[in-house]
Amino acid sequence: MSDIGERVKKIVVEHLGVEPEKVVDAASFIDDLGADSLDTVELVMAFEEEFGCEIPDDAAETILTVGDATKFLEKNAKS
């Protein structure tokens, strides 16, 4: 897993309180990790803060899995 992937995983574990081994690329934030809509908004905000980038609403709606978040951030992260 890339450095960005590891950072995404850490944020997900901290925000959702899930076991690290459950946070895999294919894991859906809602279906697999138990997030609700507020959790997903908070995750997006945490990703923006951690990686120094803005995630537009239309892009945020396409980030449904851990892998989606990692791919987006690998392309758009500033730090």
Curated annotation (Swiss-Prot):
Gene3D superfamilies associated with the record: ACP-like (1.10.1200.10)
Carrier domain mapped to chain residues: 2-77
Organism whose genome encodes this protein: Bradyrhizobium diazoefficiens (strain JCM 10833 / BCRC 13528 / IAM 13628 / NBRC 14792 / USDA 110)
SMART domains per record: PKS_PP
Subcellular location: Cytoplasm
Pathway stated in the Swiss-Prot or TrEMBL entry: Lipid metabolism; fatty acid biosynthesis
MF (Gene Ontology): acyl binding; acyl carrier activity; phosphopantetheine binding
The entry's keywords: Cytoplasm, Fatty acid biosynthesis, Fatty acid metabolism, Lipid biosynthesis, Lipid metabolism, Phosphopantetheine, Phosphoprotein
Keyword Phosphoprotein found: yes
Primary site of residence: cytoplasm
Protein's UniProt keywords contain Lipoprotein: no
Pfam family, one: PP-binding
Family recorded in the similarity comment: Belongs to the acyl carrier protein (ACP) family.
Free-text function comment from the UniProt entry: Carrier of the growing fatty acid chain in fatty acid biosynthesis.
Protein's UniProt name: Acyl carrier protein
Residue positions where O-(pantetheine 4'-phosphoryl)serine is found in the record: S37
Cross-referenced PROSITE patterns: CARRIER (PS50075), PHOSPHOPANTETHEINE (PS00012)
Entry superkingdom: Bacteria
One of the record's GO cellular component terms: cytosol
PTM per Swiss-Prot/TrEMBL: 4'-phosphopantetheine is transferred from CoA to a specific serine of apo-ACP by AcpS. This modification is essential for activity because fatty acids are bound in thioester linkage to the sulfhydryl of the prosthetic group.
One annotated GO biological process: lipid A biosynthetic process
